Amino acid sequence: MAFAETYPAASSLPNGDCGRPRARPGGNRVTVVLGAQWGDEGKGKVVDLLAQDADIVCRCQGGNNAGHTVVVDSVEYDFHLLPSGIINPNVTAFIGNGVVIHLPGLFEEAEKNVQKGKGLEGWEKRLIISDRAHIVFDFHQAADGIQEQQRQEQAGKNLGTTKKGIGPVYSSKAARSGLRMCDLVSDFDGFSERFKVLANQYKSIYPTLEIDIEGELQKLKGYMEKIKPMVRDGVYFLYEALHGPPKKILVEGANAALLDIDFGTYPFVTSSNCTVGGVCTGLGMPPQNVGEVYGVVKAYTTRVGIGAFPTEQDNEIGELLQTRGREFGVTTGRKRRCGWLDLVLLKYAHMINGFTALALTKLDILDMFTEIKVGVAYKLDGEIIPHIPANQEVLNKVEVQYKTLPGWNTDISNARAFKELPVNAQNYVRFIEDELQIPVKWIGVGKSRESMIQLF
């Protein structure tokens, strides 16, 4: 599978062609991997597969609230901020302008993974960070915790954030008071002044917040020295990558469609666009250069924290999925809520993202079930509704219409080809394809790199 089709770069056109309108711009196409549910679908595994022959792997949104796990040579690496494709020594990793960066978190993550195995050796020389990416400060994280506490006290429930400062830093960005990587590396005196103003704003909003401004600035100066060689103009970097020699460029989405700030189950969402539009805005590239868009789907559904979950099984079935699937959040360690596959939500995610193919992961977790249910429609007041209610109170009231399929009651973890799967497992996959009208390209039947069955 080729990542990138190549068209002649504008600079290579003869002068006589300058005035002629061109139907499509030239350049390489990026391959995008996106979560199609509420996260934790196994995106890291798909990225790891595709990154083996990639040249550049990018992150375009989110921060270290995301959690991707990749297993290579029996070593389990955990990624939160770094693109997980960085474990390929030939890959250049790029963190785009749409990502928010907590510098202590970045270095801590890199050091932890360096100690685990050889995958991250020389990572500093292979990482490029957009100069337009915003910085998450410790007080953003502290404010995140205070906000959650206030929500709990005032409304009796919180949003279930990871307390990584993601909401507050995107709020600073939208309020135009945030600070970016370019500010840190270009003019530390100017950066310091703006940092003091922002810190004092936060102290006035949250009186209990303690900020050691001088101490923080001292730490940030140390990080500035380390990070400076990695910071570049991201727009120019990516333009050169798209319009230079053929390159395989991969974009690794964080979070997932139903956590998108606009299209997710608001307000129980993240603070960035984790759908395909976030690729263009978070990297600074035109939509014409988006190639394949792969949606990653778990064979059942999980969700961390609170919020609507129509197919949730708060019973023995949910418990069995939770224990068999070892469903704990990579970032928070929280137990994930579990339920049947929801095709209504997947159709909605496809409407927004236009998936060209799917990766269906964790099919082996369903091995124990004699019958498997799949959500195929929503009813409200006894009537089938053709859409997903945007309002959470209404979404909580929908009744799911299920299709029941026979299980396979067989261990499929050693299957390495589609034809090696039991007929009922094959039928489950084909049913999903037929309902969604999207081909399934990969099927995951275990944790290792080898346990991804490729269909075409």
UniProtKB/Swiss-Prot annotation:
Signal peptide: none annotated. Substrate binds at residues 40, 330-336. GO terms for biological process: 'de novo' AMP biosynthetic process; AMP biosynthetic process; aspartate metabolic process; cellular response to electrical stimulus; immune system process; IMP metabolic process; response to ammonium ion; response to purine-containing compound. It catalyses: IMP + L-aspartate + GTP = N(6)-(1,2-dicarboxyethyl)-AMP + GDP + phosphate + 2 H(+). Binds 1 Mg(2+) ion per subunit. GTP binds at residues 39-45, 67-69, 336, 362-364, 444-447. Inhibited competitively by AMP and IMP and non-competitively by fructose 1,6-bisphosphate. IMP binds at residues 40-43, 65-68, 162, 176, 255, 270, 334. Transmembrane segments: none annotated. One of its GO terms (molecular function) is phosphate ion binding. Its cofactor is Mg(2+). InterPro entries: Adenylosuccin_syn_GTP-bd (IPR018220), Adenylosuccin_syn_Lys_AS (IPR033128), Adenylosuccinate_synth_dom1 (IPR042109), Adenylosuccinate_synth_dom2 (IPR042110), Adenylosuccinate_synth_dom3 (IPR042111), Adenylosuccinate_synthetase (IPR001114), AdSS_2_vert (IPR027529), P-loop_NTPase (IPR027417). CDD domains: AdSS. Keywords: Cytoplasm, GTP-binding, Ligase, Magnesium, Metal-binding, Mitochondrion, Nucleotide-binding, Purine biosynthesis. Mg(2+) binds at residues 40, 67. Its EC number is 6.3.4.4. Residues 1-24 are annotated as: Disordered. The active site is at residues 40, 68. GO terms for cellular component: cytoplasm; cytosol; extracellular exosome; mitochondrion. Pathway: Purine metabolism; AMP biosynthesis via de novo pathway; AMP from IMP: step 1/2. Pfam families: Adenylsucc_synt. It is found in: Cytoplasm; Mitochondrion. It comes from the Eukaryota. Homodimer. Belongs to the adenylosuccinate synthetase family. This is Adenylosuccinate synthetase isozyme 2. It comes from Homo sapiens (Human).
